[in-house]
């Protein structure tokens, strides 16, 4: 068996399946998709000769609805609860030696009850793999990482990935803590966007103290709060009030105005937007900001409809890129802290 394992948000398996299928077709690769709603993962089975290409072109950063992508090695069913280890050892590829081991389960109603089993099984499997020469004695991030994903007590997927090409969090979920002073839980969305959609080098270069930013539809102020923690100066646009600790903050200027109509008096370094509005309207307005040179970098959310969410996502991003009419770096992801939405990062490469 060969192909890809991709984790996703529960309920978005059809969207991830459609995304994988469309992108595989663009690569000229045929494959079989397995996706069941609310299972929290999708399988793409294909010819072994195509797996490397898929992993390079469809790794987690390039896919919108995938939290993690793995090389699929085997699917083991009807495992005996008295000895799950022997079949797993037998099913592993002859090479390589793995540098790390993650025991996982889908982030779904079906998978979450398996968390206890995953913890205990990892403690049992790890020394056996080391004794067999299949797992390094010390952590080796440069070596492939083995993933054992429990779908039930007797059903397991075996996968692997290179640490440099994969999400750095188990299940593809960053564990962020909401600080008590945060004005709203939406702050977690922007925090996750910054660590997911930008590389460490990009964050260092593009989020420098003193930069100017605009937050459209800012109230109650979660995204503004994240930006000022990066020491950016923020103009917060909203007719509604901001919450403490933003009131009278030296880095915050609150302008009571409509975020869709307000225009900046001078070009900004950043613009962020988490307004609840039709996704096409948001995409079109965001494109205006880049086309007019009102900002260099932006992060915004697109609230998705209940049906045809992949089609709407693709249409909105295509319209945005076309109407922006500038050279772009464009990335999008359904984040763990997103709901029925995706988060988009765009940067004007010409400035």
UniProtKB/Swiss-Prot annotation:
The keyword Transport does not apply. It is an enzyme of class 2 (transferase). The keyword S-adenosyl-L-methionine applies. It catalyses: cytidine(2498) in 23S rRNA + S-adenosyl-L-methionine = 2'-O-methylcytidine(2498) in 23S rRNA + S-adenosyl-L-homocysteine + H(+). It comes from the Bacteria. InterPro entries: RlmM_FDX, RlmM_THUMP-like, RNA_MeTrfase_FtsJ_dom, rRNA_MeTrfase_M, SAM-dependent_MTases_sf. Keywords: Cytoplasm, Methyltransferase, rRNA processing, S-adenosyl-L-methionine, Transferase. One of its GO terms (biological process) is rRNA processing. The active site is at 303 (proton acceptor). GO terms for molecular function: S-adenosylmethionine-dependent methyltransferase activity. Signal peptide: none annotated. Its EC number is 2.1.1.186. GO terms for cellular component: cytoplasm. S-adenosyl-L-methionine binds at residues 186, 219-222, 238, 258, 274. Pfam families: FtsJ, RlmM_FDX, RLMM_N. It is found in: Cytoplasm. Belongs to the class I-like SAM-binding methyltransferase superfamily. RNA methyltransferase RlmE family. RlmM subfamily. Monomer. NCBIfam families: PRK11760.1. Catalyzes the 2'-O-methylation at nucleotide C2498 in 23S rRNA. This is Ribosomal RNA large subunit methyltransferase M. It comes from Xylella fastidiosa (strain M12).
């Amino acid at each position: 068996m060969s192909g890809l394992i991709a984790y996703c948000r529960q309920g978005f398996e059809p969207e991830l399946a459609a995304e994988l299928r469309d992108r595989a077709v663009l690569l000229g690769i045929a494959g079989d998709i397995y996706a069941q709603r609310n299972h929290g993962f999708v399988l793409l089975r294909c010819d072994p000769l195509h797996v490397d290409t898929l992993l390079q072109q469809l790794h987690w950063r390039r896919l919108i609805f995938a939290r993690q992508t793995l090389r699929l090695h085997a699917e083991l069913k009807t495992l005996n609860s008295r000895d799950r280890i022997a079949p797993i050892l037998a099913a592993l590829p002859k090479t390589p030696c793995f540098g790390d081991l993650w025991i996982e389960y889908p982030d779904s109603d079906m998978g979450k009850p398996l968390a206890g089993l995953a913890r205990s099984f990892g403690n049992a499997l790890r020394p056996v793999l080391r004794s067999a020469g299949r797992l390094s004695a010390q952590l080796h991030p440069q070596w492939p990482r083995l993933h054992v994903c429990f779908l039930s007590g007797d059903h397991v997927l075996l996968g692997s990935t290179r640490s440099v090409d994969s999400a750095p969090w188990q299940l593809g979920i960053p564990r962020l803590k909401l600080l008590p002073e945060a004005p709203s839980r939406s702050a977690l969305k922007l925090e996750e966007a910054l660590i997911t959609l930008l590389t460490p080098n990009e964050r260092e270069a593009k989020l420098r103290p003193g930069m100017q930013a605009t937050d459209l539809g800012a109230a109650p102020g979660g995204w503004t709060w994240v930006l000022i923690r990066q020491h950016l100066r923020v103009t917060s646009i909203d007719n509604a009030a901001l919450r403490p600790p933003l009131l009278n903050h030296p880095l915050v200027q609150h302008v009571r105005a409509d975020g869709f109509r307000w225009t900046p008096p001078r070009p900004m370094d950043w613009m962020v937007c988490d307004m609840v509005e039709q996704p096409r309207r948001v995409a079109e307005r965001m494109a205006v900001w880049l086309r007019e040179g009102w900002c260099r970098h932006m992060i915004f959310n697109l609230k998705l409809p209940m049906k045809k969410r992949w089609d709407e996502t693709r249409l909105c991003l295509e319209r945005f890129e076309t109407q922006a009419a500038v050279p772009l770096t464009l990335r999008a992801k359904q984040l763990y802290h997103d709901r029925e939405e995706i988060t988009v990062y765009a940067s004007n490469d010409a400035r």
